[in-house]
Amino acid sequence: MEIRRLTYADLPQVIAIERRAFPTPWSLAMFVLELSKASGICLAAFVDDELAGYMICSRYDTVWHIMNIAVDPDRRRHGIASTLLVRLFERVDDPDAQYTLEVRRSNTSAIALYDRFRFRGAGVRRRYYADNGEDALIMWRTPGTLRGTLDDVPGT
């Protein structure tokens, strides 16, 4: 597996995966906007020279917000999302970094993945997903969650 910076040239493949992976996919304009931000980290995972997954992460003040992470449905359960997360943490390279994300409450496999990386649930965004009104679980990974506490998680 090769992990590299996501580029505009990757977007046709990104959109194809996005449409297969999510009931309410991001638009091309949303990806273009995120790629244009100098403060973000956007990663692509390639397997056999084909895009297999990607991650969009933006920095807001002192918090890294994982906005989108997706793996081609045919390539799931092969460690691609885990590798993307590891590479994000390596690139940020700050033991005091805080990360947050939203995930569908029904997406138990994604929640289990984030839990393995010491993200912890710390709130809910009611009716966050437009397609069915499902709530989003807000998860955080902070120095505190790495120690087993929520003492430095905003809002807890």
Predicted regions and their residues:
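Acetyl-CoA-dependent GNAT
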Residues: 2-78, 82-94, 143-146, 152-156
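Short, P/G- and charge-enriched loop/turn segments at secondary-structure junctions
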Residues: 30, 125-126
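Conserved GNAT acetyl-CoA-binding A-motif
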Residues: 92-102, 125
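C-terminal "cap" of GNAT-fold acetyltransferases
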Residues: 104-108, 117, 127-156
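A secondary-structure capping/hinge motif
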Residues: 121-123
